[in-house]
Amino acid sequence: SGLAKNIKDTLESTPYKGDTINVSTPRISDILMNDVRWYGFDTENPNHVDVLINFAHNDFDQTKILEIAHRAWKNDSTKYIINFSSRASQPNISKGHLYASQKSSLNHLSNNLTYNSDKSYKLTTLNLGLLNHDDLPSLTWQDVSGMIYMLITSYPSIEIPEVTVQAHANYQDVQSDKTTLNEVYYHLHTDIL
């Protein structure tokens, strides 16, 4: 996706401690198929990773990937998992019921692992608001990429379990405008048909 490419480009082009950050972009299926045997979890493999950005939403796969990464890295304090979730994970604010449930599942597991397990790795869940919208106040890809860079590089001894990030605009106003735009879009397309 455009956001994934932007994150990769930002991390690889912004020096950190005199070096660049190498980014690997595995497919969801590679991790799900290989479980804890995925090459990125194998520290003996030259292509292993130190940070897993649990990014791609596909049903409940992000929750499954978090559980696999937890088992792989449970005892490794040098590893870091960053989940991409959504403001929609919060109770009763999203009209996308299944999407909200999938993101809520990810947040629930993340909180359980943070507060009820003996994990050693760092874990952050980013709840993103509206992203890269042409007509409404929204986060840009660069906003999110900068946040990822900051999380990875700025706080080596601090764990930030959860952060909600959104454009500086009144939530109810944005949602109302979003509903209006969706209705206009719907009527334009149904009138054409």
Positions of PLM-derived features:
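Canonical Rossmann dinucleotide-binding motif of NAD(H)/NADP(H)-dependent dehydrogenases/reductases
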Residues: 1-18
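Short, hydrophobic beta-strand segments that form beta-sheet elements in well-ordered domains
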Residues: 15-28, 52, 125-127
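Rossmann-fold scaffold of SDR-type NAD(P)-dependent oxidoreductases
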Residues: 49-58, 65, 80-83
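Catalytic loop of short-chain dehydrogenase/reductase
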Residues: 61, 74, 78-118, 127-136
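Short-chain dehydrogenase/reductase
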Residues: 66-70, 109-110, 148
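Rossmann-like NAD(H)/NADP(H) cofactor-binding core
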Residues: 121-127, 161
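C-terminal helical subdomain
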Residues: 136-193
